[in-house]
Amino acid sequence: MKLTHIPLLAGTLASAFSFNTFASDIVSVQFSDGRPAVTGVEAVNNALNPIGVNVVTVDIPEAARPLLAASHRRALTKAEHGALIAAFNLSQGELLEQARLAGRAPAVQGGGVATEETGVGPYPKVYDLMALDERTRSAVLGKYGRMHVNSAEDGTDIDEVMTVVSGGPFRWGFTLKDGSIARFQIDKVGLQDKAVRISYHGLGMHAGLMDAKQGLLVAFAHGPRAFTMRYQADVPHAQLLGTNPWADVGITLPPTPSKVQ
């Protein structure tokens, strides 16, 4: 489908972003090479912008607040997922702006279309950690928690925009230009906090750790019509693909699903 505005809920505020000092204590980056950790949006972006990754904070629309409160007690319904996507909707222009802020040209000129992981389903989608049983949680950790890239069969990159709107922590690993790993973390987003949005691209090697018991993430991805998640690819520092970026800090991961390339 073409990326256009999803009709917003009545009374929903536009999802404006800002560099909010109140997020200073919930976003941070630690480095695998032992350099000092950094905290706060500005410092995080100084570390991650060189690899095309950018972080902003986002005002919570009033219409979304009852959903976020409910997410602390139970898994949300499919209809509530749709309402949450509408509340945090991003138009094609807004998605392109996220890439621009990260210093990237879009993977597909003009932004392309809402993409989907082959065999998994299309974006946008909601990751609701309260909805995961132990078997599913293990599969999610084993799949997304290892370093990987996302690309179409012809090698086309994708653009990804993830907004943590409740709960956590949520963690990502990114490969820096020198081959070290930057471990980005969004600590728990509370009901009175702003959401945190991160933009990155699929061929920038990364991993995502969603091991919290409660949390909501609204995910957009765009570019080609479909992509595949890969643990083997001709990219810089390819020897890191499939590895666990949190192994040296004592976090173990389940086995990798065999169907992932």
Where would I find each of the regions flagged by the language model?
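Active-site region of the double-stranded beta-helix
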Residues: 48-50, 54-191, 210-261
